[in-house]
Amino acid sequence: MKNNIATKRVLLLNAGHNDERLLRALKTLDCYVITTGNRPELPGHKLADKYVYGDYTDLDAMYALAVDRRVDAVCPCCNDFGVITAAYISEKLGFSGQDNYETTLTIHNKANFKAFAARLGGIRTPEAASFCDMEEALHWAAHTKETFPMIVKPVDLSAGNGIRRADGAEELSACIRDAFARSRVKKIVVEPFIQGTQHGFCTYLINRKVAAVCSNNEHSFINPYRVEVDTFPAAQVELVQADLIRQIERMADALDLTDGIFHLQYILKDGKAYILECMRRILGNLYSVPAEGLGGGFDWDYWEVRAKCGFGTQGFPPSVPQKGFWAYRALIAPQDGVYEGISIPPDIQKHVYASRMVQEAGYAVSNHKSDPLGFLFMRFDTYEEMMQIMVQRYGDITIRIRKDA
């Protein structure tokens, strides 16, 4: 689908593997794409028309870059900080497509979101205590009567970074210190740990109404707070889908949200969904690849670009199905060392319809729990077959790592 408007100059706020589909969508729309970021080695920069070195989390520097390069739109990347920067620039320059800056900070800051949900009412999310002073948080931890276990999170990080579980007061204090050390804005939340299954619920909003849905189960193996495997669709989603849509549309009305992706993570317990956090951006781990399969070819990245860069949603499909059984696996090394290769049994390999390797053999893995080597995308005939291979047979795919001497 081509753009029939004059060529737009678009600033894309990163160019990692998760952003490449955004970049390709922009090129499909005949945009002149300028990428930025402080990692010039990222693969997407080579696909852009121009790369300008910079820190996309630096609001004023990115605003100056947008003005200097005379861009017509800013496209957020697959990172919460990128969404915040895009909203900041767009508000100052009068670009359409982004939520306003205050709204963006409400959604993409865990403490702000909890406070908003409490004010709005009718949003089922674990109640949280928030702290911007570490000593105050430690004093609270030493005297709290709350029931353990608890979850401690920096308010401003994503992809599971900085999240820890505390099973007692001493451990809680250690988790609080760690979360403050990791948070850029030096603010954390502490909330009860809910025992249940974790899921994702991705929607696309048009005029503050849900126009498309994608659901999935989230599985973690090596790092309990980083999603490693997603299986589509979510188990028992029929129990909670209508209620989640109601809550999303209630938030969309209250915040006057723009068109585009609205994603949330939730815990399913006793037939009810407890919302953990929300975000307005594409998802990591190349989530949109199997999501496109589930949606019968619906291209989440393309429609996100149209919404966020002011192209509008004309031609949006009248319906987006959830058909079939799809999955991805992020290839996470079991330990640090030198990556040597991957072994996949033939009866599993036959389900792999696409892959994307991020690193090659010889790559030195130094942070294995948060550094995916690549991704496998799979499809299955039945839900049971999918769960058996992706979860029960997780260990049958071997990532070979040579330990450093």
Q: Residue ranges of each PLM-predicted region?
A:
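A conserved helix-loop-beta module that forms one wall/lid of the active-site cleft
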Residues: 91-162
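Short beta-strand-to-loop capping motifs
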Residues: 167-168, 203, 331-334, 376-382
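Internal nucleotide-binding/catalytic subdomain
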Residues: 163-273, 282
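Active-site "cap" helix and flanking loop/linker of ATP-utilizing ligase/carboxylase catalytic domains
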Residues: 243-264, 269, 279-336
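Glycine-rich active-site loop/lid that clamps phosphate-bearing ligands
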Residues: 331-361
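Short amphipathic beta-strand starts and helix->beta connectors
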Residues: 34-37, 146-147, 311-315, 350-364
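ATP-binding N-terminal substructure of ATP-dependent carboxylate-amine bond-forming enzymes
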Residues: 1-103, 135, 323, 333, ...
